[in-house]
A protein has these predicted regions:
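A short, structured beta-strand/loop element
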Residues: 36-51
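Cysteine-rich, disulfide-bonded extracellular modules and peptides in secreted proteins
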Residues: 51, 65-67, 81-88
Length: 97
């Protein structure tokens, strides 16, 4: 399965489809993963990571590309070292925490 690089408009569409289906979703932000060295990567995830990713040179640039309606969850000690943060829907965050 290879990554499909999407832009901010496509990310809004992917996220809207997940919201309509009422599934838990989020964007996993990584820095410098082996398949995209030196880049920040936002990977869309539902029950599992998907093929949809956005790429940027900086964290701020990538955060600006994320669709609206998200809440940031900081990196947890159990996360792999390349994970920087995870963004969940605000509704999901209220249910989880």
């Amino acid at each position: 399965m290879s990554d499909q690089i999407i832009d901010a408009a496509q990310a809004r569409s992917v996220q809207a489809n997940a919201a309509k289906a009422q599934v838990l979703f989020g964007w996993i932000i990584q820095h410098d993963p082996p398949e995209h060295p030196g880049k920040y990567v936002a990977r869309f995830a539902t029950a599992h990571p998907t093929i949809y990713i956005m790429l940027a040179d900086t964290l701020a640039e990538l955060q600006a590309m994320l669709p609206p309606g998200l809440a940031r969850s900081p990196r947890q000690p159990v996360d792999p070292p390349e994970i920087v943060e995870i963004w969940f829907s605000k509704q999901a965050r209220r249910r989880i925490w």
